[in-house]
């Protein structure tokens, strides 16, 4: 992967770790940082050797505090224009609806506005006990336009979501867990170990099965009738799984009492 200035990308076997690297400004994002993150997730999506991703923030204070409002204000004063997010959305992830590989958000501090929207776009959200979440855009004359309004209202009860969004209030990691948008809360020092543990458990499964599962779940959310959703399994990732080497290897390894050797094809 190309060298980056505002993010760090590490590869550990089948695992990609993406770190937002602007701790001096609470990992807020401007167009250049957004583009770097988008490039990283483009590579993740395209690389058949990468099966799971973790996204986190540098430092101990912030996962991502959203847009770099100082940059936005300066640009608008100079040009009259607002910065645009990349086509795949804030952080290169918020509008990436075609990504069938799993993403884990390891939230190490504040996740505000667009930062919270990145975390909501992940499949699993592991939070440090120091993490805090909010969609505070109405407090500065904006709205959570990178998927926060739509995702939060789908991931937790509507009245609780509205209570957060209409006030812009901050929510602790523990309350986020109780509401249901946080998968697990751990002591701050254990955050990355916990995220790696979850990634390791996913990597024990067939990547073909994981992609099929994610694709069916996410696309079925748009089907109002359960019976119709259950009948419709003609999704590309599900069909690919049924025709894969992995679907033969899994039962064979089970019968032979050994770990399966997944090929991802």
Question: Model segments located where?
Answer:
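C-terminal alpha-helix plus adjacent terminal tail
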Residues: 1-16, 48, 60, 71, ...
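Crotonase-fold acyl-CoA enzyme core
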Residues: 94-208, 243-244, 248-252, 258
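Short glycine-rich anion-binding loops that position phosphate/pyrophosphate groups of nucleotides
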Residues: 59-61, 109-110
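Terminal peptide-recognition signature
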Residues: 18, 22, 36-37, 55, ...
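An acidic, glycine-rich surface segment that forms the CoA-thioester-binding/catalytic face
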Residues: 35-42, 69-108, 140, 155, ...
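A short, glycine- and basic residue-enriched loop/turn
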Residues: 23-26, 60-61, 66, 130-132, ...
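Conserved CoA-thioester-binding segment of acyl-CoA-metabolizing enzymes
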Residues: 1-60
